[in-house]
């Protein structure tokens, strides 16, 4: 994907604030979810649109200060994701939460990375999305 400087910054911010800041693996997992959402008709079609969507990512994700000393994993992961790299265990998952959170709703968990648990929501396309990727509507 060819991304603008602003789109790259939005992706870096999502990775920085949502994953363990020292974890390339966690950053890749968050970046994979962001890109899965960008590619889905159910979410905004831009990285900044996805990351800035109300109550979907950390509060203030697009405005809070980042510590330059802790940005390296997110910067490297963002560049990898923008070149087509994806976390191999996240697959088509479009959702995650802190691994310590006890989700009261059914979910198909696919991996834990960077302090987050990544999952698919149940539904008629659950198995298809996990095995084949998101279905075309």
Give the residues covered by each predicted segment.
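Bacterial extracytoplasmic/cell-wall-associated proteins, especially those involved in peptidoglycan
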Residues: 1-137
């Amino acid at each position: 994907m060819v991304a603008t400087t602003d789109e790259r910054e939005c992706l870096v911010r999502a990775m920085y604030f949502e994953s363990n800041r020292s974890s390339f693996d966690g950053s890749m997992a968050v970046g994979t979810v962001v890109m899965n959402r960008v590619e889905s008709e159910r979410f905004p079609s831009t990285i900044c649109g996805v990351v800035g969507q109300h109550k979907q990512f950390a509060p203030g994700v697009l405005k809070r200060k980042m510590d330059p000393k802790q940005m390296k994993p997110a910067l490297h992961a963002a560049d990898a994701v923008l070149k087509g790299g994806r976390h191999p265990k996240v697959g088509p998952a479009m959702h995650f939460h802190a691994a310590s959170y006890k989700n009261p709703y059914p979910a198909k968990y696919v991996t834990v990375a960077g302090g987050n648990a990544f999952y698919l929501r149940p539904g008629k396309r659950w198995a298809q999305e996990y095995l084949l990727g998101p279905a075309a509507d």
